[in-house]
Amino acid sequence: GDRGKNYPKSDELFSEEYCLFLNTKNVTKNGFSFDTKQFITKTKDKLLRKGKLERYDIVLTTRGTVGNVAYYDELIKYKHLRINSGMLILRPKTPNLNQKFIIHVLRNNNYSRVISGSAQPQLPITKLKKILLPLPPLALQNEFADFVTLVDKSQFACEIAIKVWRNSLKFSII
């Protein structure tokens, strides 16, 4: 994200405004979370040079809680988002990448070997660039992504079934 003179100060963050200004609580190990939100004005948004999300960008946390990944797709209702200085935007330049595949690889990467800092862990971009990601042909990436989607749906269905079973068990005990 932009770390320049126009970086938002605490008195320039609002509970409602034009552009959602992401913090580390918004990017979790499971993707985006909007339980807590802070916004900047349109004027402040225009002053910042870097860190504006575009649809289908991937956000990676690089300071504090390192390695959390979120995907900015059409399911995210906010149209204007910016990352803070402890995050990176990954915007693939090549069309032969399946975003779901890349997100899975990023979420399951062990960043510990390239993290520096003991008080506040960080993943400098220079070290991040040295990480090699597996890149099979697009057909295999797509097959893997479809499989992960199927597993996610099955896991969700199982979680619902367990909740229903627990609720019915509670009522049968009463």
Predicted ranges, named:
Residues 1-30, 44-48:
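Low-complexity, Lys/Gly-biased intrinsically disordered segments
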Residues 18, 36, 84-86:
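A generic structural signal for short beta-strands and their flanking turns/coil linkers
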Residues 132-174:
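Amphipathic alpha-helical coiled-coil/heptad-repeat segments
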Residues 23, 43-107, 124:
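A short beta-sheet element
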Residues 27-28, 65-66, 112:
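Active-site/binding-pocket entry motifs
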Residues 14, 79-88, 100, 117-139:
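A short glycine-rich beta-alpha junction/loop motif
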Residues 26-39, 81:
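Short, basic/aromatic beta-hairpin or loop at an interaction surface
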